[in-house]
Structures are given as C-alpha cells and as structure tokens.
Amino acid sequence: MLFQTTQAHEELRAKIRAFAEEEVKPIAFSLDQANEFPAEAVKKLGEMGLMGIPYPKEYGGAGLDAISYAIAVEELSRVDGGTGVILSAHVSLGSWPIFAFGTEEQKQKYLVPLARGEKIGAFGLTEPNAGSDAGGTETTAVDKGDHYLLNGGKIFITNAPKADTYVVFAVTTPDIGTRGISAFIVEKGWKGFEFGDHYDKMGIRSSSTAELIFNDVKVPKENLLGKEGEGFKIAMATLDGGRIGIAAQALGIAQGAYESALEYSKERVQFGKPIAAQQSLAFKLADMATKLRCARFLIYSAAELKEHHAPYGMESAMAKMYASDIALEVTNDAVQIYGGTGFLKGMDVERMYRDAKITTIYEGTNEIQRVVIASHLIGKISKGNEGGSRSVAKKPAPITGVRKRQIFRDGESKDKVAALVEALKKDGHDFTVGIP
C-alpha cells in the first residue's frame, strides 16, 4: 500500500510536536535521572483532548482515527520514549478493552473519564510465570455470589501506581488453560489492592512501572469485562492494537535519534569538512532514513486496517517487530555518529539508546511477534495426541514401483483416462474432488 497522511494528520503532528518540544523535551533529562513521572505534562495532554484521541466524542474522546493516535505516540516519543508509552498504555491497554468489550454502564463509568484524561488507565496481564505465555496466569478470581475475590499479583505494569483504573486478568475456572481466564475492571483504592515499588529501569524512566498486589480484593460482579472465560480473547485482541502504539513509540525514539545525529553530522567538522560529507557516514544516514520510512509505512498501514475494521493482527505484529528492531539499529548508529560525546549522560542519543531496547520486549517480545506473523502465514498446526508431536495433513503417496513409468496404451482415450484416475486413487491422489 502506498500511504500518505492527510492534511489533518500533519496539522495534528505539528500541534503535538510543538507541545512535546515546549513541555516535555526541556525536562526529559531530569525525568530520566530522577525516575520521575511527568504528571503535569500528562495532565495537559488530557486538557488537549489527546488522552482519548481515537475514541468517539460521545465517550469523551477526540473522535480521531487510529493513525492520529499513532502520530501522537510517535511525536511524544520523539523527545521522550517514556512519555510516549504513558499515552500508548493508557489508550491501547487501559481504555480500549473497556471500549471494545465493556457494557454501556462500564463505558460511562470508566471509559468516559479515561478518554477525557481525568483518570489514567493500565493493563494487568504479566505475571512472574505468565510473560510471553499468558496461559501461565496464576492470579485468581473466585465467584463469591455478589462479587469475585481477587488474589495474586502482576509485574511490570506500565502506568502503575499512577493509574486509577486497571484491566486485570485472572483465572476464574482452573485447570482448563486460557479458556478459564476472565477480565475485570479494578479501581485503585479498593481494599486489598496495593502496589510494589516503582521499578528502577534501564530506559523509559519517566514511565511509571510497578507491581500490582491483590489480597482478597472484592470485585463487584458488574466489573466483569465481557463474559467469564473471555479474558484471553480480550487480552490478545488488546495486544494486537497495543502493538501499533509500541511500534509508534519505537519509531518516535528512532526518529528523534536520527534527527539529532543528522544535525550533529552537519556541524561536526573533521579533516576539514563536516563529517556528513564522509561517504561512510552519509551512507549510514541514508540507511537510517530508509529504515524510518519503512517502519512508518508499516505502522500507518496497520493503523489504517484497524480503523476500517479489517484484520490487522499480522500487520501490527510486523510493524511492532520491525519498528523496534530498527529503533535499536538507528539509536546505535546515532550514538556512533556522535562518537565519545554520544556516550555521555545528558545526551539525548544516549537516553534514546537506552529507551529503544524495551520496545523489543514488551507487548510481546519480537520473538513472539515472529511467531504471530508465522502463524498467520502458515496457519495453526494441531498438536498430536502422543509425545507432543505435530500432526500434519497426510500427503498423497508418491508414485513408485511399476506405475512410476506405467504407460496406458489399451483402449480409447477415455479408457486410458479412467485407468489413470483409478491408478492415481490407489496412490492417494484424487483430482476429481470438487468436480460435479
């Protein structure tokens, strides 16, 4: 698909870029050093109507499309990857499941304040034994009649403990795997719901990340999201869309590093000329720009498919995988272009280099993205009943023995064809299937 954004998209980009340059970039280094959440900037994003950018106005959103959302995450991440993922996790993970699977009452109670930016959302799926394999979920929700009793914990939860509303996944029916997982809307402040320490991360340090702890938390029956047993389906559908946000975050980080390196290469003089004039470095810049454009096309095309309710799971996995892979490459090249200066704390490219790494890990590692893509291309191969072996469709037996060079000479043409068909059937072939 040849893709071109609209004038409205580019006007939105300019608006968010101006905000990011004025409100986020000047404090990005201090946020990183202090491991500090940009509360004031997030509040202003809500006032600008950007915390509910892809949701209908009737639910407090801006009523814009999925590409607009990707642009918003991209532009924030261009100056600070942590701020970008705050928006991504809030919109894609904390709000979208309620929009897509919630009742009207749940949407009015929870989605509206989330979309208006009055509250922050988060998504509780990952556990110590349930990372890439969500089927390892151990948090439980036991039906107690008028409520569920929630026990367990979640780790690496983006926006915790700053978020007010959490979509949490727990086992309601044990011993049946992913079919026994359900989703719930849980509020901060409920008795028994506590938080672990804020993680001290390598990158995206302005993004708050913490552990969720549930000790006999009473969850009202009306806070079940979807139906019992639909939790895994809700989680996977949510992650499909969330990968567009993480891809946009990775792209934004890489874009910021590229722009900084490009500008520096024009100013830095060695051997009597700007280093950008050195062919080896110019080629590096050309490769960086090409990777950025490829990533942007993948992201926007996946967002376009999502917007038009077309299947997009494979495309969002491709976008997330590729954008995060090239983010590592581009930020690495940016540090290399800066040389020793780029290795110093306080340099944007040094921070971006650290920020980029997480994009290959969360919302499905890039190894998992390749599994997702391959499953779309190849299809599912069912497990055999014994020894974990795979069963595949039985292939027709090859023509061997006397028929390998058999020539049908007897009878008229129709008799020869009939004899050939019978011989093929005996060998497992049947090209008459489907012929009336």
Per-region residue spans from a language model:
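Short Ser/Thr-interspersed hydrophobic loop/turn segments at strand-loop and sheet-helix junctions
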Residues: G49, V73-S77, A170, V186-K191, ...
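A short core secondary-structure module
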Residues: D146-F195
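Short Gly/Pro-enriched turn/cap motifs at secondary-structure boundaries
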Residues: L114, N129-S132, F156-N159, T173-D175, ...
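Long, acidic (Asp/Glu-rich), low-complexity accessory segments flanking structured domains
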Residues: N215-K233
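Thiamine diphosphate
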Residues: K394-P436
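Alpha-helical interface subdomain recognition
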Residues: M1-A89, F101-Q106, P113-E118, G131-A134, ...
